[in-house]
């Protein structure tokens, strides 16, 4: 059996993060959505997404999947699984029980489908429409909006911690740090936690990945996930639920933030209730508001519908797409959305929506030259 993780329409409300990836490659918790599915399915997966992104995934295509996606004769049984859905053991069991010609649904949400028909991204709904519907009763959790990535991170870290630590023993806990709730702390081999660190895992689990470094004087309050080769700088104050993805460097004060991978917020400054994509960099003393002075509900700009939408949240900070950067002393307003590969600098607050490939700040924006953007990304 082979599995293809498909994008549903939530990919549009998950921008700017889905400009550069399928939904399945969004990180929330310790894992990306794909990594969680693969852990529980005990199988590699492939991807069905927008045409302009599909070529990214074909290089790693499993036998038979390419034929299924592009309409040639398939030679392997395939189940399509919604990449926006959080995988669970119970859900995996229900999916694996599907017979050819059946689909698993909850309301109008397609969770999974076992179809022998040729499937393209644009005809997925029409192909699965006539399948026998099997209702899944337990409530499924999904990524439906970009702010879900940080607001659902607490539950995701807890679930992933149970998966990744099941039947395993943590590396030795250092004697020179202060720990409360040590039964909820798991350190992978090769990770280093230096003297003077304070880790409180009573409020939620703390996972420290392989070769991660937690430098002197760091204060951590779970839930927290520090990925492989991540670094938390000296004296940092980290509140849960926070994910520091592989290769990230962070410092200052951080509260309920998801860093995807290879991004830096290495200096002082506040960042809360936020999502930072891959290969982003935030200059020293960057500060981001996450609460309106009147405590009102926060609205953010929806790039797909080209209008402001309600989040239902009182706390919402910065949502920054891949490869975007900001200079020292940058200040972001509550609920700011920054697209892909933008460069922000100067005094004052930039607009609350900064499109992709913009260069400038509060005094005006110009288009970031694509060749210069590519040069920076390639470095």
Residue ranges and their predicted role:
Residues 10-13, 25, 30, 234-235, ...:
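Glycine-rich hexapeptide-repeat left-handed beta-helix
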Residues 13-17, 21, 129, 171-172, ...:
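General secondary-structure edge motif
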Residues 77, 196, 341:
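Conserved beta-strand and immediately adjacent loop positions that scaffold enzyme active sites
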Residues 168-182, 186-277, 292-293, 319, ...:
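Extended beta-solenoid/beta-helix repeat architectures
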């Amino acid at each position: 059996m082979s599995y293809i993780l498909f994008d549903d329409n939530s990919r549009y409300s998950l921008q700017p993060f889905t400009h550069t990836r399928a939904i399945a490659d969004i990180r929330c918790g310790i894992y990306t959505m794909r990594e969680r599915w693969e852990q529980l399915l005990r199988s590699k997966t492939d991807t069905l997404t927008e045409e302009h992104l599909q070529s990214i995934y074909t290089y790693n295509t499993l036998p038979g999947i390419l034929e299924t996606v592009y309409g040639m004769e398939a030679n392997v049984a395939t189940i399509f699984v919604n990449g926006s859905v959080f995988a669970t053991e119970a859900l995996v069991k229900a999916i694996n029980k599907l017979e050819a010609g059946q689909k698993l649904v909850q309301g109008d949400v397609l969770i999974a489908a076992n179809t022998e028909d040729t499937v393209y991204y644009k005809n997925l709904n029409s192909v699965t429409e006539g399948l026998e519907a099997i209702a899944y009763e337990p409530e499924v959790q999904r990524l439906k909006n970009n702010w879900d990535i940080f607001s659902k991170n607490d539950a995701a870290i807890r679930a992933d911690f149970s998966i990744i630590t099941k039947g395993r023993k943590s590396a030795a806990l250092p004697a020179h740090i202060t720990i409360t709730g040590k039964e909820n702390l798991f350190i992978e081999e090769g990770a280093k936690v230096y003297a003077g660190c304070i880790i409180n895992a009573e409020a939620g689990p703390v996972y420290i990945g392989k070769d991660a470094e937690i430098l002197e004087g760091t204060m951590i309050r779970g839930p927290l996930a520090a990925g492989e080769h991540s670094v938390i700088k000296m004296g940092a104050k980290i509140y849960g639920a926070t994910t520091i993805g592989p290769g990230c460097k962070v410092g200052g004060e951080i509260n309920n933030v998801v860093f995807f991978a290879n991004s830096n917020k290495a200096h002082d400054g506040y960042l809360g209730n936020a999502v930072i994509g891959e290969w982003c960099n935030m200059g020293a003393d960057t500060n981001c508001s996450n609460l309106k002075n009147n405590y009102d509900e926060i609205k953010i700009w929806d790039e797909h519908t080209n209008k402001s939408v309600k989040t239902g949240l009182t706390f919402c900070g910065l949502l920054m797409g891949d490869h975007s950067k900001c200079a020292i002393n940058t200040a972001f307003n509550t609920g700011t959305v920054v697209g892909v590969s933008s460069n922000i600098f100067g005094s004052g607050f930039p607009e609350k929506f900064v499109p992709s490939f913009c260069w400038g700040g509060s005094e005006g924006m110009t288009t970031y030259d694509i060749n210069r953007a590519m040069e920076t990304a390639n470095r």
